[in-house]
Amino acid sequence: MKRVTLLLVATMLAAVTATAQDWAKARLEKSPRHLEWVKVKHGDRVVNCFIAYPEVKDKAAAVIVIHEIFGLTDWVRGVADQLAEAGYIAIAPDLLSGSAPGGGGTAELGGADAVRKAISSLPPDQITADLNAVAEYVAKLPAGNGKLAVGGFCWGGGQTFRFATNNKNIKAAFAFYGTGPENEADLARINCPVYGFYGGNDNRVNATIPTSTELMKKAKKTYEPVTYEGAGHGFMRAGEDPAGNEANKKARDEAWKRWKDLLKKI
């Protein structure tokens, strides 16, 4: 009886997880835009990337989308599609490419815990090299106008802030609830404005904002954090979920508007 109960619980949890992803998958399936997978190669690395193209007449700016600690999920791919809907070429690299047995990435790692463990093991230099390779790839796209921005969420928000210290071609960095670097020499290399998006109920991350503000001011760099009261960590994803609470939905809508308005300035 105990075994049957455990199996039932496992089945119910799997069903909840599947349902939680349905709304993200549905967006991608209904998108009228050109969406595709590409392989970005550099050295002995192959980075699998999802790219979304806008339906526009003129050449477009590009945005690199850096995934959360959950890896490259349907929701992150949906963010890329929403950026394409707004008129931008959006590319989302799976920075876990090659981390799974057989050379796979996020999808082949087999669960959230395995993904988190793999993320924590990624060498910082490899992350930078992967992102630089992706930046070079989109810079050469015939449909692009050469302008590049980067945006990321959670773990990817921190990596967005960090990547701004390692690539001088970025026109703007959008860090969603991620912590910033604390090395003054690193921050001195930033060549673009950094815009922060934070949930009011996310003290783990928000406790680092004053330090980032002080260090960026000292380095004479632009850093503009905005906190959305009542929202939690991960509000961009949670606010898109039909079952999400109103505070996260409101924060998500306001953050998207701000993001799009700022992208128009690059």
Q: What do the predicted segments below correspond to?
A:
Residues 28, 37-140, 237-241:
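Serine-hydrolase catalytic machinery in alpha/beta-hydrolase-like enzymes
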Residues 152-156, 160:
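Gly/Ala-rich beta-loop-alpha elbow adjacent to hydrolase catalytic centers
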Residues 190, 196-198:
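Short beta-strand/loop motif that positions the catalytic acidic residue
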Residues 169-179:
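A conserved short beta-strand
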Residues 4, 12-40, 47-50, 155:
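An N-terminal hydrophobic leader/cap segment in hydrolases
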Residues 217, 222-266:
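C-terminal catalytic histidine-bearing segment of alpha/beta-hydrolase fold enzymes
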Residues 201-206:
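Acidic catalytic loop of the alpha/beta-hydrolase fold
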Residues 142-153:
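Alpha/beta-hydrolase fold nucleophile elbow
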